[in-house]
Design a protein with these regions (language model features):
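Conserved catalytic-core segment of nucleotide-activated headgroup transferases in glycan assembly
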Residues: 1-37, 41-42
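Acidic, amphipathic alpha-helical patches
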Residues: 48-51, 112
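Short alpha-helical segment that forms part of, or immediately flanks, the ligand-binding pocket
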Residues: 52, 74-80, 93
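Acidic donor-binding loop of glycosyltransferase active sites
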Residues: 53-69
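Nucleotide-sugar-dependent
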Residues: 64-74, 93-95
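Short hydrophobic beta-strand element within catalytic cores of glycosyltransferases
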Residues: 82-87
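A charged, aromatic-enriched C-terminal amphipathic alpha-helix characteristic of glycosyltransferases
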Residues: 107, 121-157
Length: 157
């Protein structure tokens, strides 16, 4: 409901709104009227290939965190070059992950809409693809610390 309220405010403000398609991925839902002839269209749950294709074709996204651990969708969107709005939660702030992430402390619908408008007003047809946060993308040993934990636990057994 929060994101829908923000999208409705953004639709009211965005001058070139007819140029934008607004999608929702995840749980399937009926289309949602956002005003000015625009609808939030559900694409439902996507395969990994469909998800990657959607990210490749997207310019902006919103993915809010609802728990203190980092949410993967904002990270995934950002490495695909999508400008993504997310929020801080407790001690988590993803703003330093890369320059495609806009991390908000204030997630009121009007504040989200304002940030989305800024992003969309700076739209460029061709978005240069840069390797952002290469360590995150290439790290083959993400859970290297598990070996150390096992050694500690085995010592105590």
């Amino acid at each position: 409901k929060l994101i829908v309220a923000a999208l409705r405010r953004w639709v009211e403000q965005q001058q070139d709104i007819e140029e934008w398609t607004i999608l929702s991925a995840g749980e399937q839902h009926a289309k949602v009227d956002l005003g000015r002839g625009k609808y939030l269209q559900s694409v439902g749950k996507l395969t990994l290939q469909e998800y990657a294709k959607t990210l490749e074709e997207s310019y902006a996204g919103i993915s809010l965190m609802a728990s203190p651990h980092p949410s993967y969708p904002p990270l995934e969107m950002s490495v695909f070059g999508v400008k993504v709005i997310t929020n801080t939660f407790a001690n988590k702030d993803l703003k330093d992950f890369n320059s495609n992430i806009v991390s908000l402390n204030n997630i009121s619908p009007s504040h989200i809409a304002k940030e989305l408008k800024k992003i969309c007003d700076n739209y460029r047809m061709i978005v240069p693809h840069e390797m952002t946060n290469q360590e995150y993308c290439d790290n083959e040993n993400v859970f290297d610390f598990i070996k150390e934990i096992k050694q500690i636990l085995n010592k105590d057994a």
